[in-house]
Each structure stands twice: as C-alpha cells, then as structure tokens.
Amino acid sequence: MADVEDIQPLVCDNGTGMVKAGFAGDDAPRAVFPSIVGRPRHAGVMVGMGQKDAYVVDEAQSKRGILTLKYPXEHGIVNNWDDMEKIWHHTFYNELRVAPEEHPVLLTEAPLNPKANREKMTQIMFETFNAPAMYVAIQAVLSLYASGRTTGIVLDSGDGVSHTVPIYEGYALPHAILRLDLAGRDLTEYMVKILTERGYSFTTTAEKEIVRDVKEKLAYLALDFEQELETTKTGSAVEKNYELPDGQVITIGAERFRCPEVLYQPSLIGMEAAGIHETTYNSIMKCDVDIRKDLYGNHVLSGGSTMFPGIADRMSKEIQALAPSSMKIKVVAPPERKYSVWIGGSILASLSTFQQMWIAKAEYDESGPSIVHRKCF
C-alpha cells in the first residue's frame, strides 16, 4: 500500500435524513443523497428487474411505489446495520467511485452514540470494506472546527434529532450534552398538518417530499411570534405562492413561520420538551461556571434545520432573555452550516497533526473494535 500521506482520506457524514460524502481537503461534499434504503414490498414483484434485494437512494425514490422505504438511522443513531452497510457501499462505489481499501475513512457520529455502535462502525469499516485506517468524530465538534473555533456551544439540528453540545478546547463535555428528539422531519410533518387546515392534502411519501421543499424554500422564523400572527391577520405581506409539480399553485401565509416555531415551542406539536433556546441554556448551566462566558460568546448553529432565515436573531433574543443580563451573547450562523459537519471533517482529516490520530488496520487487528474508544474521543 502507498504511504497514507499521499492518499486523500474520505469523509462521510451519515445523517438521519441525508448522507454527505466526499474527499478531505475539498470545501464541500461531492455526494449528498437521502439516507434511504428501499426493499421490495412483495417478493416476486421485481422478477426480471435484476432482482436486487435492496435499493439505495434515487433508485429507491423512483421505484417507491413497489418498495418499502427505510431510514437506517433514527434520531441520529444507526439501528439497522445491514441497511447502513448498503448505504456505505453505495457511497464508496457508486457516488465517490473509490475503492475504500485504498483510503482512510473519517466517519461522523451523533453525540452520546452508544459504545456498541462505535465498535460496529469500526468493525464494518475494517472487516467489510478493508479500510487502511479510520476515525470516528462527533458531528457537533466538527461543526465547531468548521467555524474556526475550538471552544463554544453547538446547536446541531438535522432531520432526525437536535443536540446542544458544549465543547471546550476541542473536546465535547458529555455530562452537559442534551438531546432533543425534534428536528426537520417533525417540522415537515407539522407543515403537512397546517397545510391540511388550509385545505391542501399531502399524504404519500412523495407528497411529503414536496412539503419538505415548501418548508426549505419558504419557511422562516419570526422574531416575535405573536406579533407576526397579528400582522398576518391584517395583510397579505407574508403570503407566497408555490407551484406544485402538477402545475397547481398553492398559497401559504402564516404557515411559513408557524412551522419552524415548533423549534422554540415544541408544545405546538404536543411535545413536552424545552425549545432549542432553553435546551441550549440548560446545556450551558450544566457546565463549569468558569467556562460559561466562552459558551455564551460562541454559540454556533449547524445542520439543515438551522437554515431558516431569522433563526440567529431569534436565538440571540431568546438566549439573552434567559442569560444573566450583563452576559455578552454571540450567535454564529455560518452560511455553509447545512454542511458544516462535513466541512469540519474535511478540515480535520487533512491536518498534518491529525495523521497520527487515525486508527490503522494493524492496530485494529491487534486490539479489535474496542480500540475506537481509546483513539476517538
């Protein structure tokens, strides 16, 4: 095998909703596709179609009528390893078109990922894909690196889960990490519900994808929710049109800001949970009093569900209301935050100082999967 230094590492960020994959040193992922595996609903239906037992991604999307679609990752944690393996196989061979046995692989994991899961990821990379080296990094930590910081608190909110992760000098503080099972998928479901109240019906998986697009293109966060609702009663300033694939045009108004408001008021969907602002505050309060100032001053947003216009101003306002009055608060919403986990991985894997951090195949062969706890933390 050639020297590890000469070979570009692969970076793969497996989200609940989307896989982001590419090469270390690049400034954006080369491949972004849904974390979906489709399996035939009825044995025999697919006869003569090459008889695959599983389809990934676009194939799954296009044949969705006869396939059952499954997301192998749930709330950020992998729960179906066979399907996850299919997704990695597709990532390496079809999307990136590389031989994984020739590249070190950096994978990402959710904060508080169970130990057994980290071991399983490690085992699959070395035993199934014969990777020469691998590493597992916490998603929120990578987002913080991507913002050019090593200390701060990250709110990472994707499709399946949100976390608040305080990080001090590059290390996540596990006792203060909080998880909120409220994220993009719940917002899409809520948008479906409130559009139904307007008389628009979206029921199939395909139609829900349309609603996800409506959400991504038109939703925003109000600085003051009640005031925004009052404004919409008197005029049509917030109304926007959206053309459906069949040419029908729908109009949406208050739904635009009612949908993401759930992040701050989970009770809107009947959830008994603190909103993202309060969860962030609770995370900070679990940290040593001496570092709180650094956390308040470096609050970084990351993940697709932080892409709503207005989120940074709203977050500042809400945290300001909870924090001590003299505290200086800074909320950072980098424009590339949808991919900042991946970008942080790309940066980390290309650092010369990182090269001694990889778990090498030889170390794995000697120690087994538990090596991951000693080398990745």
From Swiss-Prot:
It is found in: Cytoplasm, Cytoskeleton. One of its GO terms (molecular function) is ATP binding. GO terms for biological process: cell division. Its EC number is 3.6.4.-. Keywords: ATP-binding, Cytoplasm, Cytoskeleton, Hydrolase, Nucleotide-binding. SMART domains: ACTIN. It comes from the Eukaryota. It catalyses: ATP + H2O = ADP + phosphate + H(+). Pfam families: Actin. It is an enzyme of class 3 (hydrolase). One of its GO terms (cellular component) is actin cytoskeleton. Its main location: cytoplasm. There are at least 13 actin genes in potato. PANTHER family: ACTIN. Actins are highly conserved proteins that are involved in various types of cell motility and are ubiquitously expressed in all eukaryotic cells. Essential component of cell cytoskeleton; plays an important role in cytoplasmic streaming, cell shape determination, cell division, organelle movement and extension growth. This is Actin-71.
